[in-house]
Design a protein with these regions (language model features):
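Active-site-proximal alpha-helical scaffold in enzymes
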Residues: 73-102, 115, 131-168, 207-214, ...
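Short glycine/threonine-rich loop-to-helix capping motif typified by GTGT followed
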Residues: 58-65, 236-240, 282-305, 316, ...
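C-terminal catalytic subdomain
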Residues: 245-306, 317-322, 339, 343
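Beta-strand segments within the central parallel beta-sheet cores of soluble alpha/beta enzyme folds
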Residues: 46-55, 96-101, 150-158, 219-229, ...
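Acidic, glycine-rich active-site loops and adjacent beta-strand->loop/helix elements
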Residues: 15-17, 55-58, 76-77, 100-105, ...
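Conserved catalytic cysteine-centered active-site region
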Residues: 4-5, 51-133, 173-197, 230-234, ...
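Condensing-enzyme catalytic core mediating Claisen C-C bond formation in acyl metabolism
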Residues: 1-28, 154, 187-255, 259, ...
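Conserved active-site "lid/cap" helical segment
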Residues: 1-83, 87, 141-148, 170-171, ...
């Protein structure tokens, strides 16, 4: 007879200071700070940790923190959380730290960002840089459905205004913004202007996923209810065509994440109208409109009017990216920015999101990726197990 699965939950979260440039810090120093901060938040001792996921830093941190022998995960972004929860539920670990950080690795902005290498350095020189890849998807949607430039600006202004009210954001008190401010910034890749795009910054973060039946944790647990993962290929190597499909011929890259969202909701046993807050990944303004459609919060082609009607505002029916996201809160490399969607969701579900708290938040949806990167991942979190 197989052993009964244990209950895994996110029990600790921590963001280091985020900044455009954190002089005196390294990726390793920020990672160590984040580990200790998340464990303190969870009320779990370092001696109890028997698993870690931190990309290329994983084995370094296992050695530095004397965690071995320990389980090591290999996921990235939101996938780190699903992987850790599965490891705990199946007896491979009891307490797993997920950590990511970046400082001092991207200060020569004439070069491609290190987290897009080696792929982007071979295509960016021909004009296919990240903004252009996402712009291709946006322009196609605008052509087919009539999505307007103003609707993109509403998304960017909404998220940047969230960041302006978040004391932990890199761009705290930068704002408020109105849609005209977005198009007044310099053009980057049609239809995007500078303020449609993610910033670049430095910082670190960590989460603790643990067996809640074993630990007396300090904070209310947040449970993984469902997840889904859609990939169409490697990011930043090929033009991200809207119509790209796999052998099944269904759900083209333009709606990548639809299958992932359907799976996540099926696993969770939830309907879309039960979600209280959407911590959507926001590399560029249009990606929010695309995800709202792909995840079936509105019909295809209705994403633009949906945001124009105020649904994504902090006091709207579907508040999005409530910390300011990669546009305003932080964008410190591949894993920090992606993990921070889940960290913000945990803060909302705990009721600790400060001036940007969504009232009575019990269910949150998080996302990573986008059609320009040819993948989208989805995670549903709740303040109660299901």
């Amino acid at each position: 007879m197989s052993a009964r699965k244990r209950t895994a939950a996110i029990v600790g979260v921590y963001n280091t200071r985020q900044g455009r440039r954190l002089d005196g810090e390294t990726s390793r120093s920020l990672a160590l700070e984040a580990v200790h901060g998340a464990l303190d938040d969870a009320g779990i001792e370092l001696d109890s940790v028997d698993g870690i996921t931190s990309g290329e830093l994983s084995t370094t941190l296992i050695y530095d923190l004397r965690l071995g022998p320990a389980w090591q995960g290999f996921g990235f972004g939101l996938g780190m959380i699903t992987e850790a929860a599965a490891a705990i539920e199946n007896g491979l670990a009891e307490a797993v730290v997920l950590v990511a950080a970046q400082a001092g690795e991207y200060r020569e902005h004439e070069a491609t960002a290190p987290w897009t290498r080696p792929e982007n350095e071979f295509v960016a020189s021909w004009g296919m840089f990240t903004a252009a890849e996402f712009a291709l998807i946006a322009r196609r949607h605008m052509h087919v459905y009539g999505t307007t430039r103003e609707q993109l600006s509403i998304v960017a202004a909404t998220i940047r205004n969230n960041g302006a009210r978040n004391p932990e954001a890199v761009y705290y008190q930068r704002g408020p913004f109105v849609p005209d401010d977005i198009t007044a910034s310099r053009p980057i890749a049609d239809p995007f202007h500078l303020l449609d795009c993610a910033t670049t910054s430095e910082g670190g973060c960590a989460l603790v996923v643990a067996n809640v039946e074993k630990f007396d944790v300090a904070r209310p647990p947040v449970y993984v209810l469902g997840s889904g993962f859609d990939f169409y290929g490697p990011s930043y190597q090929h033009p991200p065509a809207w119509d790209l499909t796999g052998r099944s011929g269904t759900d083209p890259n333009g709606v990548v994440g639809r299958r992932a969202a359907d799976l996540a909701f099926a696993h969770a046993g939830l309907d879309r109208d039960e979600v209280d807050v959407l911590e959507l990944y926001d590399p560029f303004s249009f990606e929010i409109i695309r995800q709202l459609e792909a995840f079936r919060f509105c019909p295809d082609g209705d994403g633009g009017p949906f945001v124009a009607d105020g649904h994504i505002a902090i006091d709207g029916s579907h508040p999005v990216t409530t910390d300011g996201g990669t546009m305003s809160f932080s964008h410190a490399g591949t894993n920090p920015q992606m993990m921070q969607r889940a960290i913000r969701a945990v803060q909302q579900l705990r009721g600790t999101a400060g001036p940007l708290q969504v009232p009575d938040a019990h269910i949150a949806l998080c996302s990573n990726g986008g059609a320009g990167a040819m993948f989208t991942t989805v995670l549903l979190l709740g303040d109660q197990p299901r």
